């Protein structure tokens, strides 16, 4: 795209605090945005071909609340991204990310994290440091097991659909705020589903279709009645 078009977008963003440039075939993060590090609240560069974020610029957007780079070619995230102390929404669906920076737990304001369609091989332990995290989407990755650290996750909703999960720590029942757990289309045997999820957790929507067991058998598990009480109570609340 031409420089004049980009300049026009930058000028608009200066007034609105929102920079949106989708579907433009961009191969790199626009360096012109460094003029706006103290204005921008929202950046959306989805549906481009960006393969990296510039470490020297990305951490300087001190007011940024929402960053979207869905459908790009990112393979790694720089540590400097984690300087964004006001960031509430981070959407990086359909990239090529295998892991998150070790400093990711410093994104202390983060509420919504979308990483669907990446190449994560494990549940990132850094997520357990994020105290305000509400919604986490890790669907369509390559996660094989959910470790004990999951018990410290603060999220209300966790989407793990379409992974390769065959092991699930019993500690998932200890998540203090977890209400919605999506595990559809994984590799779980019925014996690998901790009974405490049903009988002794906060979870009121558990989606497990498309695993290695029949739903009929799932409904026969001890504790299923208790789970259904929570499910029905929640349904009534929102009816």
Curated annotation (Swiss-Prot):
<feature type="lipid moiety-binding region" description="N-myristoyl glycine">
    <location>
        <position position="2"/>
    </location>
</feature>
<dbReference type="InterPro" id="IPR050216">
    <property type="entry name" value="LRR_domain-containing"/>
</dbReference>
<dbReference type="InterPro" id="IPR001611">
    <property type="entry name" value="Leu-rich_rpt"/>
</dbReference>
<keyword id="KW-0449">Lipoprotein</keyword>
<dbReference type="InterPro" id="IPR032675">
    <property type="entry name" value="LRR_dom_sf"/>
</dbReference>
<feature type="repeat" description="LRR 2">
    <location>
        <begin position="63"/>
        <end position="85"/>
    </location>
</feature>
<feature type="repeat" description="LRR 6">
    <location>
        <begin position="154"/>
        <end position="175"/>
    </location>
</feature>
<feature type="repeat" description="LRR 5">
    <location>
        <begin position="132"/>
        <end position="153"/>
    </location>
</feature>
<feature type="repeat" description="LRR 3">
    <location>
        <begin position="86"/>
        <end position="107"/>
    </location>
</feature>
<dbReference type="GO" id="GO:0016020">
    <property type="term" value="C:membrane"/>
</dbReference>
<keyword id="KW-0472">Membrane</keyword>
<keyword id="KW-0433">Leucine-rich repeat</keyword>
<feature type="repeat" description="LRR 7">
    <location>
        <begin position="177"/>
        <end position="197"/>
    </location>
</feature>
<dbReference type="Pfam" id="PF12799">
    <property type="entry name" value="LRR_4"/>
</dbReference>
<keyword id="KW-0519">Myristate</keyword>
<protein>
    <recommendedName>
        <fullName>Leucine-rich repeat-containing protein 57</fullName>
    </recommendedName>
</protein>
<keyword id="KW-0677">Repeat</keyword>
<feature type="repeat" description="LRR 4">
    <location>
        <begin position="109"/>
        <end position="130"/>
    </location>
</feature>
<feature type="repeat" description="LRR 8">
    <location>
        <begin position="202"/>
        <end position="222"/>
    </location>
</feature>
<dbReference type="InterPro" id="IPR003591">
    <property type="entry name" value="Leu-rich_rpt_typical-subtyp"/>
</dbReference>
<dbReference type="InterPro" id="IPR025875">
    <property type="entry name" value="Leu-rich_rpt_4"/>
</dbReference>
<feature type="repeat" description="LRR 1">
    <location>
        <begin position="39"/>
        <end position="60"/>
    </location>
</feature>
<dbReference type="Pfam" id="PF13855">
    <property type="entry name" value="LRR_8"/>
</dbReference>
